[in-house]
């Protein structure tokens, strides 16, 4: 059997100020993300305008981070490390950094194999993110049949990794599990996407349930962050929970288990918005770093890649057209 090549797909993030507008326009004009059914041209004009208006608001947030968003650099480094371990090409892809796309597409087109496995760096599948990535490659390289690992949030090795990551964090700080309330935070999604067949929330709950089986002495909540735009989103929101939670546990610890790399949602939103809110209410509030920082992350991902079955692109997205605005 031909040795496969791998496509390591991530969200992308601005590396510096010049990337920010490009990043926001690419993100918000993706109809898989915004879910509108506006005519294509109108959609692009409207959300380009919205993206440009958001730049002055978001720019100071990114500038306050030490090295902007580390997600780009984490993905590049991970691709090189995986390539050495798997002894195969591993091509990185940054969905919302269009200036990097041609390099990825060229690398795919010049491969000496047509056996390509896609690795989306998202534990839980949603048509708005993983689905968007899959459709991108169906459009731009239809001649290359990529099969995908759809999700791994409930994979026993991922569950064990998150469990060890949390326990290591507690041990380093001398905190007992019975003294903790954990807020397991994932990115939010509009409820209408779920009602139209997106499996995201179901997978998040399954993953949360599998992980918290290992934490019976703590108080545990699943919550959803980063709401953008109108309409009802999955609840409880992380912000609401931080504002309203009533627990006798002295330590409230946010666990961003839906995010592989730290980026704006963890380094700014959790760190600068949610933790101060909890502290103002008298709790010791902490954030566990994203799983990328774990020394066991790479070996766990290698096992997941080797042991999980893949799904062809057409099968993966066939029921995902209801909410995306795709015609």
From Swiss-Prot:
EC number: 4.98.1.1
UniProt keywords, alphabetically: Cytoplasm, Heme biosynthesis, Iron, Lyase, Metal-binding, Porphyrin biosynthesis
Protein localization: Cytoplasm
Molecular function, one GO term: metal ion binding
Associated pathway: Porphyrin-containing compound metabolism; protoheme biosynthesis; protoheme from protoporphyrin-IX: step 1/1
Ligand binding (Fe cation): 187, 265
Catalysed reaction, written as an equation: heme b + 2 H(+) = protoporphyrin IX + Fe(2+)
Coiled-coil annotated residue ranges, if any: none
GO biological process, one term: heme biosynthetic process
SUPFAM superfamilies: Chelatase (SSF53800)
Disulfide bond annotation, renumbered to this chain: none
GO cellular component: cytoplasm
Record PANTHER family: FERROCHELATASE, FERROCHELATASE, MITOCHONDRIAL
NCBIfam families in the cross-refs: hemH (TIGR00109)
Function: Catalyzes the ferrous insertion into protoporphyrin IX.
Membership in a protein family: Belongs to the ferrochelatase family.
Name recorded for this polypeptide: Ferrochelatase
Gene (name only): hemH
């Amino acid at each position: 059997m031909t040795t496969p090549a791998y496509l390591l797909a991530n969200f992308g993030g601005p590396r510096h100020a010049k990337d920010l507008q490009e990043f926001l326009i690419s993100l918000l004009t993706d109809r898989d993300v915004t879910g509108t059914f506006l005519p294509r041209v109108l959609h692009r004009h409207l959300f380009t305008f919205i993206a440009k208006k958001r730049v002055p608001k978001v720019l100071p947030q990114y500038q306050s981070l030490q090295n902007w968003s580390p997600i780009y650099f984490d993905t590049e480094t991970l691709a090189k490390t995986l390539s050495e371990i798997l002894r195969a090409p591993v091509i990185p892809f940054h969905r919302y950094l269009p200036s990097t796309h041609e390099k990825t597409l060229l690398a795919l087109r010049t491969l000496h194999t047509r056996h390509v496995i896609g690795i989306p760096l998202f534990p839980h599948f949603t048509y708005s993110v993983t689905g968007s990535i899959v459709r991108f490659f169906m459009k731009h390289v239809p001649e290359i049949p990529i099969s995908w690992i759809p999700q791994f949030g409930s994979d026993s090795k991922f569950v064990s990794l998150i469990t060890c990551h949390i326990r290591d964090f507690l041990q380093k700080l001398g905190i007992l599990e019975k003294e903790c309330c954990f807020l397991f935070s994932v990115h939010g999604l509009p409820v209408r996407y779920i009602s139209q067949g997106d499996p995201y929330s179901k997978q998040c709950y399954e993953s949360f349930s599998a992980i918290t089986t290992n934490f019976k002495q703590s108080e545990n909540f699943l919550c959803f962050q980063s709401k953008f735009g109108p309409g009802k989103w999955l609840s409880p929101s992380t912000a609401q929970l931080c504002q309203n939670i009533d627990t006798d546990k002295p330590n409230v610890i946010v666990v961003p288990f839906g995010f592989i790399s730290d980026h704006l949602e963890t380094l700014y939103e959790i760190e600068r918005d949610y933790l101060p809110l909890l502290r103002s209410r008298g709790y010791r509030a902490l954030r566990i770093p994203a799983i990328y920082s774990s020394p066991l992350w790479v070996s766990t991902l290698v096992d997941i890649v080797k042991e999980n079955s893949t799904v062809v692109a057409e099968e993966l997205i066939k029921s995902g057209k209801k909410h995306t605005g795709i015609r």
